[in-house]
Amino acid sequence: MEKFFPIWDITTWPGNQRDFFYQGVHRHEEYLPCLLLPKRPQGRQPKTVAIQGAPGIGKTILAKKVMFEWARNKFYAHKRWCAFYFHCQEVNQTTDQSFSELIEQKWPGSQDLVSKIMSKPDQLLLLLDGFEELTSTLIDRLEDLSEDWRQKLPGSVLLSSLLSKTMLPEATLLIMIRFTSWQTCKPLLKCPSLVTLPGFNTMEKIKYFQMYFGHTEEGDQVLSFAMENTILFSMCRVPVVCWMVCSGLKQQMERGNNLTQSCPNATSVFVRYISSLFPTRAENFSRKIHQAQLEGLCHLAADSMWHRKWVLGKEDLEEAKLDQTGVTAFLGMSILRRIAGEEDHYVFTLVTF
């Protein structure tokens, strides 16, 4: 299964992650048997399902769960799917490619099998993820799109042709998307069914804190502090944010700091957490450079959020006065991540910052 399904990699988040554990949102798994249900009784199964949610909420994990269950023949087994997971950057390459070549990359050396797969497009299940990392614009002019899955096309045309069902209209699409990208994709999608991932509810947040700290006095104190901070506790609906809050508050407790004084608001929790990464991950920074690079990082993050610009280029780094030493350090800390196939393009690992 690993040969055909090499996507169970460990997601990298900021920090050393020694204390990280993944606690799935139980309700997300409950969606699996319902993802392709008709919108109304006697209706047709949707051919396009958009799974939307905040960054880190679990969209990619759900996509991987679909792939895993498909590999075990437990996801709509009666459909005889042939499923493929694509990160949008795989589709949106700088060189022209055809959809059949994309499939061949997943199953190298199996041209006969690829031909057999493409002979039954109604059995294709395509999962598309990573729209926020696109470095080119989607095409919404139908006359510019293509029906031919054998034709070599620019990445933006190929992706837009798939999304619009101009190409492979019989195939079923599962699209993982953030709220901020919905308006970009919506004009292309044909009768999409929307599924929103809500993240942890209150009881699941409490359970996560208890699993992280154990049923200890320290854990009770941290949980009580977090629950009193309405904004901070609401942000904990995102699983990875919940972990970061736990990790950051634990650091403060271990240093003997009073949480109310050291973390008076939600922003201070994240600032202290990010600052704590520098002593262990950026020993080559002097105090002055440390401060300058951290200010540059904050400038970059604020500018990105204000302008809804998720892919950052060389000019953005220069404007924030981040030099190569700083960029390398932030890559090492997993605060920034280089986009695959794009030497000078980066994204924040977690947009919650």
Region locations from a protein language model:
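Intracellular innate-immune signaling modules
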Residues: 1-353
